[in-house]
């Protein structure tokens, strides 16, 4: 990393430069040309460091920001030890004194929402900082991994959202990845290099929402914020704190996880401790140099020129201690710099990178996730902070009726189940701030499904119904709350589920009710035939009367069902929703392990470890495909058996009719 504008002791000069960066640079530097990007080195380029000398304020506080309404406002920064600092804003002033560590913190009383741009002044002994164009409204945190991070310009209908994004009262901030455990209560403002994309991304600056500034912003966040602003007229500040390829444990304080007394979490922490202890930076450098020399020799042997700027590795790498998925790393580097900030709430969309740990990893997720939510609420000084869980999105080929069982063998639904269980634990205990939104029903194969606009709208429905009270009135929950299962009964070879409300098909489509699988005690699942319950009564037209809040699950291949699963695949086959089109979430009644269902019932023993595991998994999937084929054959045979008597009867009647007609013709010809 290099810094192109390091802070000097002349802090007034620095902060005037910072103010310019937040106004002039933000308006013209955002549209950085490709040629200027190419001039930058392939590494992070820092414009404003996280912490400067003399009087300075956390980079969280800038020109163009939104200050949270209706909550005390805390501002922090650094100055010379013992220096008095005065913060003035919106007719208020608060004093603070820098401590021995240079840190100071001042608090202002809660303010009402205001669309009038205002100036915040931070005055020290010999310098005054001015932050302009600040609004007072609602600040929302956007967390998770790449599906939250995914650019608005790249999603379905994103071009329209971008082109119509002239909303000067919406403000945007995308945070950098941070420094992990070395972070302070601030962050760098920089051009962040991405090896994945092969380019720089501008991070750490508050922007006024426009087509230019929003195009690379979080698609879900942009749609969410826009819908809130259009409904409320209150200024909206969106802080994108998501980082691609991250796990739930990296977003949770390490100390919180150390306090979890559960074997799966303890094992995960022990594995990380062992990796960190075993890492040898010198040995790693030797391997880097050896690989570099090998590649250079290969290029020379192939007659390819050596790059002019090619140099052998010389720097020691920090190794796993700096891995972004080290437990607590992203919390320390991204969330901790925000601690103490007043915000309205958070939306969190994550899960993909936790889909590689089998049943143990899913159990660890459940152990950690609720505590992560509590830690975020503590960070923002609000134990009831509104927090919306967006469940794991789809990936892979869609599950179909013909290919039903193989897709069930996946960690994805286990992670989704852990997310939904966490939500239910909190909601059913009376947590009024917790929210939930499914995204699996959009049914895209790409693990970055580009249907983000309706995903953002689902989160907005939750916020408008709960935080703002602008959607649904007394029936507000109906617009976002997933239907729940209130009662389960085993009746005459079926599983009967009583739901919290009526269940219909998505978009009121015709056809079968889809989405459930059932199994007996043998743990062999089959797709269930799903019907609404009827007690045999009929209406005036002799049509059966259905209770649409009661579902009956059955399968001729499961004569004694014991358990059910719903939406049990990474890209599940289901069309069951509430009357307000809220999907029925991924859930199950059993607690069987992935490694026991279907492995133990298909294979002679447990899945082997190491090199043989992939081969065994392929064998398992082939077995499941055969089981699906066997079921389809039996379904076809049953269909034939059902249709054959009527077919034979109709065929015989047709033959009799033909014979009678022929006889009649012969009789007529004889006359």
Task: List each language-model region with its residue ranges.
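Extended amphipathic alpha-helical heptad-repeat regions
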Residues: 613-671
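Short, Lys/Arg-enriched N-terminal segments with co-localized hydrophobic residues
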Residues: 1-11
């Amino acid at each position: 990393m290099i810094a192109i504008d390091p802070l000097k002791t002349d802090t007034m000069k620095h902060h005037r430069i910072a103010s310019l960066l937040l106004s002039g640079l933000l308006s013209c530097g955002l549209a950085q040309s490709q040629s200027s990007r190419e001039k930058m080195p392939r590494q992070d380029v820092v414009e404003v460091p996280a912490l400067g000398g003399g009087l300075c304020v956390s980079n969280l506080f800038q020109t163009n920001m939104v200050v949270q309404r209706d909550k005390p406002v805390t501002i922090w920064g650094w100055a010379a030890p013992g220096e008095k600092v005065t913060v003035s804003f919106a007719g208020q002033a608060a004093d603070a004194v820098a401590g021995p560590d240079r840190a100071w913190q001042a608090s202002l009383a809660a303010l009402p929402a205001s669309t009038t741009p205002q100036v915040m002044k931070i005055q020290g002994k010999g310098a005054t900082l001015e932050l302009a164009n600040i609004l007072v409204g609602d600040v929302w945190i956007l967390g998770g991994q790449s599906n939250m991070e995914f650019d608005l310009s790249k999603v379905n209908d994103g071009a329209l959202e971008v082109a119509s994004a002239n909303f000067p009262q919406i403000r945007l901030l995308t945070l950098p990845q941070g420094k992990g455990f070395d972070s302070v209560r601030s962050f760098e403002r920089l051009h962040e290099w991405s090896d994945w994309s092969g380019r720089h991304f501008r991070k750490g600056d508050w922007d006024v929402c426009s087509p230019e500034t929003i195009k690379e912003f979080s698609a879900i966040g942009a749609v969410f914020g826009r819908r809130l602003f259009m409904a409320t007229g209150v200024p909206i500040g969106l802080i994108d704190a998501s980082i691609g390829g991250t796990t739930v444990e990296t977003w949770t304080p390490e100390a919180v996880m150390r306090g979890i007394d559960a074997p799966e979490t303890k094992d995960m922490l022990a594995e990380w401790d062992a990796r960190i202890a075993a890492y040898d930076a010198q040995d790693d450098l030797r391997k880097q140099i050896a690989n570099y020399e090998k590649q250079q020799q290969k290029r020379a042997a192939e007659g390819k020129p050596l790059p002019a700027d090619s140099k052998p590795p010389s720097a020691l790498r920090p190794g796993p201690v700096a891995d972004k998925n080290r437990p607590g790393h992203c919390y320390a580097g991204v969330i901790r710099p925000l601690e103490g900030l007043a915000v309205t709430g958070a939306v969190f969309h994550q899960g993909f990178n936790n889909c590689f740990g089998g049943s143990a990893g899913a159990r660890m997720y459940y152990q950690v996730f609720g505590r992560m939510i509590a830690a975020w609420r503590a960070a923002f000084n609000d134990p009831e902070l509104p927090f919306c869980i967006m469940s794991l999105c789809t990936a892979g080929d869609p599950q179909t009726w013909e290919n039903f069982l193989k897709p069930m063998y996946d960690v994805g639904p286990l992670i989704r189940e852990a997310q939904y269980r966490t939500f239910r634990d909190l909601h059913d205990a009376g947590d009024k701030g917790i929210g939930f939104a499914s995204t699996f029903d959009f049914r895209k194969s790409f693990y970055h499904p580009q249907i983000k606009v309706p995903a953002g709208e689902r989160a907005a429905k939750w916020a408008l119904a709960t935080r703002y009270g602008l959607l649904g009135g007394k029936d507000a929950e109906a617009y976002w709350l997933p239907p729940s299962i209130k009662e389960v009964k085993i009746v005459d070879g079926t599983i009967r589920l009583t739901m919290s409300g009526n269940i219909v098909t998505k978009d009121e489509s015709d056809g079968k009710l889809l989405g459930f699988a059932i199994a007996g005690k043998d743990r062999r699942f089959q797709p269930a035939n799903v019907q609404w319950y009827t007690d045999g009564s009929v209406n005036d037209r002799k049509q059966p009367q259905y209770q649409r809040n009661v579902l009956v699950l059955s399968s001729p291949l499961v004569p004694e069902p014991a358990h059910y699963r719903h939406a049990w695949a990474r890209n599940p086959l289901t069309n069951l929703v509430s009357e307000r089109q809220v999907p029925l979430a991924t859930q199950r009644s059993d607690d069987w392990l992935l490694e026991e269902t279907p492995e133990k019932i298909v294979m002679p023993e447990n899945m082997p470890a190491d090199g043989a595991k992939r081969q065994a998994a392929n064998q398992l999937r082939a077995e499941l495909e055969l089981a699906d084929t066997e079921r389809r054959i039996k379904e076809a045979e049953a269909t034939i058996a059902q249709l054959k008597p009527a077919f034979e009867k109709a065929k015989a009647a047709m033959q009799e009719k033909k014979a009678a007609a022929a006889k009649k013709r012969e009789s007529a010809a004889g006359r």
